[in-house]
Amino acid sequence: MPDLNKSIFENAKSMPLVCAHRGSASGNIPCNTLAAFGAALMQGADMIELDVAVSADGKHYVFHPGMERAYLKIRSLIRLLPSKKVDKLRLYNPDGTKTQYGVNTLAEAFDFLRGRCYINVDKFWTDVPGISRAIRESGVEKQVVVKTGTSARELREVREHASDFMFMPIVRSVDDVTDALAAQGVNCIGAEVLFKTLGEPCCSPAYIEEMHKKGRILFANAEVYDHKAVISAGLTDDASVTQGPEAGWGKLADLGFDVIQTDWPGLLKNYLLSRVPSSGKAGAPNI
């Protein structure tokens, strides 16, 4: 696990941090559950990514909005249901069988992960004020990384409610916001970058070097949620598993990315550890 007494920059020096996408789901254990988070930590994940959905009466749950039909076999959305109904729902496993696992609250997830790893809060933009309060109430401010898109509304809400949290804007192709955010007092620790080709500015050696000189980290997505959605130029989990880890994860590490998000945390962690010499970093020199 990362040393949470150190900065995220320091923890990423020896090798890229492993971010487990919705934990590690397999067998009967669904994603975005405490069980999936525990499984990811057992495999060496440094960061857990989780999604947040808000019920009709404002309660925060760990669930990917819009995936209700896939994971809960219901036609409604959590945002349209009162919390008393959400609390009774049960998740389904990949075979379509109902499990014993319910939809965890965000407070339960924070309590489970407190002091154990970084927590990457996705869908933060759905309720920046409310999720920010939940983070503070749970006392996990120093281990949470929040992110939003780059719309004026989203960035305004971050400035107003979450400027002290570790924040990463999600940028596609070109980063034209991190410098401005830092100048506005936002604790902008870097960026999550999406790119279709390796020729795009946000994955160029010059940009990566510049970001590292400014003490910022870069977050890449190797997970594949839809093979038609290209967000890391094909340097994916699929490529890493089917062609060998150097075909995906290795190239992301060589480019200098500091955090790699994956659905295969154990495989990625073992691969990165195998690249670390007796002294040095598993990948291109960065911070």
Labelled PLM ranges:
Residues M1-I287:
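Phosphate-group recognition and catalysis centered on beta-loop-alpha active-site segments
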